[in-house]
Amino acid sequence: MKRAIHALDAMLAGLTLAMGQDSPALVSFLFHALFQDERERNSDLLDPQQGITVKMFRRLVEYFLGKGYAFVSPEDLLRGVASSGRYILLTFDDGYYTNVRSIPVLEEFSVPAVFFLSTDHIQYQKSFWWDAVFRELKNRGKTLEEIVHVNAGYKRLKTTDVELCLRKEFGQAALNPVSDVDRPFTAAELKDFAAHPLVSLGNHTKDHAILTNYSDSEIQEQIHGCQDAVREMTGKSPQMIAYPNGNESPEIRKVVRDCGLQFGVLTRPGKNRLPIEAGSSEAMTLKRFTLWGDREVDAQCRISRSTMSFYRFFKDVEVQTDARLSSSRHS
């Protein structure tokens, strides 16, 4: 079903772009780990998630530059961008060491990117829990569908509780990284990485906390703690947060603003209308597209430029329905 919707979107994008409907907007893309090639992507050392290789990432940058888009950083957005422009914001979540592979591409085309950091993983050199789940269950012969189902259950818990479950089920070493592919940056590596002029840093909470699972005081600790840790390790203060798993609320956004952050990004696809005023409701809920390694890069780029999308329409309906259900449960 999803593939059929994407096929329809590809046709719709071709029609709308042929009619000149490539409106001014901020278009953002979400990445996680960067794989050197397909062999590494299929190594089962970690959850491949979107399965993006360096070659695919490079092609996306090349594509949008060829279409006249300008690449921006959070600092550019804070200074303000022209409402008549078309912009790309490249974002990487979590703090995987393999994000260093983006640097040659960023340098080749002189484009910036923002990297959202889960600081406890860096400071304590822990595997991300979903990678541990993927490794352990793959080794036990579980299918991808079964692993996704297990992860959905864990996403209802706090990170510390998930990690406790994994250590109990798979042993104390379950959250130890097994290679350079699945591990986070070290603090020393991050300091060097952060010094690059094309690198901006973002807040991703202390331990990739899905914030809607936490109390008000815990939310503050997660966001403020990450902000403090990034400053301590790099001397930089993030201007932007990526809400882990995309989960946020008006109460969470207030904490984000109180912490001095000016922008927040979701995992929900869509174009962001201009202008974007720092600290506004729109600035705190910027949408991001996800690039997938099993689909043609150019086709996905065209879909993201289009003003119309069946997939985005259905996702918006799903989000609105979930919000109404959540509101009714808490009323």
Language-model features: locations:
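C-terminal active-site subregion of NodB/CE4 polysaccharide deacetylases
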Residues: 1-91, 97-99, 128, 134, ...
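Metal-dependent polysaccharide deacetylase catalytic core of the NodB/CE4 family, i.e.
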Residues: 29-35, 85-88, 109-247, 285-286
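Short, glycine/acidic-enriched loop or turn micro-motifs at the edges of active sites
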Residues: 96-97, 207
